[in-house]
UniProtKB/Swiss-Prot annotation:
Organism: Dictyostelium discoideum (Social amoeba)
Name of this protein: Signal recognition particle receptor subunit beta
Subunit structure: Heterodimer of an alpha and a beta chain.
Classification of source organism: Eukaryota, Amoebozoa, Evosea, Eumycetozoa, Dictyostelia
Task performed by this protein: Component of the signal recognition particle (SRP) complex receptor (SR). Ensures, in conjunction with the SRP complex, the correct targeting of the nascent secretory proteins to the endoplasmic reticulum membrane system. May mediate the membrane association of SR.
Taxonomy, superkingdom: Eukaryota
Gene name as annotated: srprb
One GO MF term attached to the UniProt entry: GTP binding
Length: 290
């Protein structure tokens, strides 16, 4: 045993108490294997065994932490990319200003009424690099919401429009609609980015965007408790998935979601013939549809 080159090398790098354990195990294994006259030396076999154990321990430690994902839907660096659709979906409650935004982002016929829409309005958005993307304005009525799962499954990004002048009164409804969008399986699995656009900033009664975010987070936190972990509407009743919004045991925050949720404000309608403050929307589309 003293002539073993392998054990002598181990003695240089390992503490004495570890070497005592190795010598003890060595003698046990050597005594056990001696009758079999194996062509492999005991110290080589012992080294191979220790190496195998070491590899298993390392793979368990780094493999489990590397593949760990938040059970609650938080972002992780090794998440598998899922191909998204190509549509830009404009969503929100009725009278939020969705159609006005569509008109000012696309080449849609300006004759389209900006009053409450009954059916979807469609157009084409042209990016800075001349890429043409379908853009869909989805009415806020219940009938249109029934077709929303299909629209979301084909979406590259979502613009959720809020009427900043009525948000305080409608905050619960806004949160309910947003909850259904964020817990939609396609939005969740494909990590479809969302921009919450606080519209009508040209009017004095518009609420501040930071307040909108804080109120929505509180409302969504309440909805998690009352509605559980499954979406209830949007045509998903027959195919419910266990999707929990945010991190369990902590107050809801948009930062806890797997997909990027941004906030911006502005006015979707032209003022004195000029369109104001929708550059954030254009930048959002540009960066999320590359």
């Amino acid at each position: 045993m003293k002539d073993s080159a392998i054990l002598n090398q181990l003695k240089v790098v390992l503490p004495p108490h570890i070497m005592e354990i190795i010598y003890f195990r060595y003698n046990q294994i050597d005594t056990y294997l001696k009758p079999y006259n194996l062509p492999i030396k005991t110290d080589v076999l012992l080294l191979a065994l220790f190496t195998l154990i070491f590899i298993i321990i390392i793979s368990k430690l780094f493999g489990s932490s590397g593949n760990k994902t938040r059970s609650v839907g938080g972002r992780t660096s090794n998440d598998k990319k899922v191909k998204r659709g190509v549509n830009i979906a404009i969503l929100g409650l009725s009278n939020a200003g969705k159609t006005a935004l569509l008109l000012n982002l696309t080449n849609v016929d300006k004759k389209i009424s900006t009053h409450t829409s009954i059916t979807t309005n469609n157009g084409v958005y042209i990016t800075e690099n001349k890429k043409k993307l379908p853009i869909i304005d989805v009415p806020g009525n219940g009938k249109a919401k029934a077709s929303l799962p299909k629209i979301l499954s084909n979406s590259a990004c979502i613009i959720y429009v809020i009427d900043g002048t009525t948000f305080i009164d409608n905050s619960t409804q806004e949160a309910q609609y947003l909850y259904d969008i964020l817990t939609n399986e396609s939005v969740y699995q494909k990590k479809i980015p969302v921009l919450v656009f606080n519209n009508k900033m040209d009017l004095d009664s518009t609420i501040d965007t930071e307040q909108v975010k804080n109120i929505l987070e509180r409302e969504l936190d309440d909805l998690r408790r009352t509605r559980g972990a499954t979406p209830i509407v949007l045509g998903q009743e027959e195919d419910k998935k266990d999707i929990y919004l945010g991190i369990e045991g902590t107050p809801f925050q948009f930062d806890h979601l797997p997909n990027d949720v941004q906030f911006s404000n502005g006015s979707a309608s032209p003022s004195n013939g000029e369109l104001k403050e929708i550059d954030d929307i254009k930048n959002f589309i540009q960066t999320t549809t590359l």
